[in-house]
Amino acid sequence: MNTPKKHKKFKAKMILQIIMVIIGGIIAAYGLETVLIPNSVSDGGVTGLSIVGSQLFNLPLGILIAVINIPFVWLGYKQIGKSFALLSIIGIVSLAAGTSFFHHTPAIIEGDTLLITVVGGIILGFGMGLALRNGGALDGIDMLAVLLSRKLPFGTSDLILFLNLFVFIFVSTVFGLQGALLSVIAYYIASKVIHVVEEGLSGSKTFQIITTQPELMVETIRDQLGRSATYKEAYGGFSHEKFKEITCVINRLEETKLKEIINDIDKTAFVTVYDVAEVKGSNFRNLNHH
């Protein structure tokens, strides 16, 4: 009975994802063509290889981005699924078309290398992060890294770094050593922006707290942050004492306040903090600050 309604909702969500992936591709293309490439700064991954090929053989950048990414999109289809591959194709086509559209647009920044790498990295990272957040990708090298990590005794992040090392060596043959180093910096900034856009500024964190005053700690967290917490019975390996370990998941924006609460109640508390990829259930997103 609810099937037509669910189908309509899914269709609307898919259309929104497609629009956002297209916007992401266009933004990334703008960053490349108006900030990075005019100042001899490249990107990593397939886009970086495409930029090198474009400069060496005087071929349109958009065509190279589209062609070189084809096998990687196929890998994405095999590893992740049809929806991801479709959105990635849309994103890559948008990026490729965007580079052609903005190719003759004057550079918005020139001369200041620090500003170029920072602004270029931010624009590029925002575009790529927007695509990833909505289920697509603008560069295929990550898909290759995932496949290789299943065959080799290395993690995905290590392989991405290793593969990009070769990309930046190629970049140095076109843009020189300085251009390659600036490209590394821009790539690093872009990767951080991608993480922020994909996960959001308000990503979650888990605090594990061992304190002599667990009841007061939990009560204060509830009253001041509006957050619940759970107890877990733990046993000290050195002291052989039983104690209550508190686990509390908070919004990243609440981190400073929680640290203040912990410090006020028990300066000797043992605290472990780690990032959380996703939180579901209950009313976690509803803040109730006092």
UniProtKB/Swiss-Prot annotation:
Source organism superkingdom: Bacteria
CDD domains: YitT_C (cd16380)
Keywords, comma-separated and alphabetical: Cell membrane, Membrane, Transmembrane, Transmembrane helix
Disulphide bond pairs: none
Annotated gene: ydeO
Residues annotated as transmembrane: 18-38, 56-76, 83-103, 112-132, 165-185
Source organism of this protein record: Bacillus subtilis (strain 168)
The family this protein is said to belong to: Belongs to the UPF0750 family.
Pfam families with a match to the protein in the record: DUF2179, YitT_membrane
Membrane topology of the entry: Multi-pass membrane protein
Entry keyword annotation includes Transmembrane helix: yes
Name of the protein described by the UniProt record: UPF0750 membrane protein YdeO
Alphabetized PANTHER family for the sequence: UPF0750 MEMBRANE PROTEIN YDEO (PTHR33545:SF2), UPF0750 MEMBRANE PROTEIN YITT-RELATED (PTHR33545)
Cellular compartments annotated: Cell membrane
Presence of the UniProt keyword Transmembrane in the record: yes
Primary residence: membrane
InterPro entries: DUF2179, N-reg_PII/ATP_PRibTrfase_C, UPF0750_membrane, YitT
One GO CC term, this protein: plasma membrane
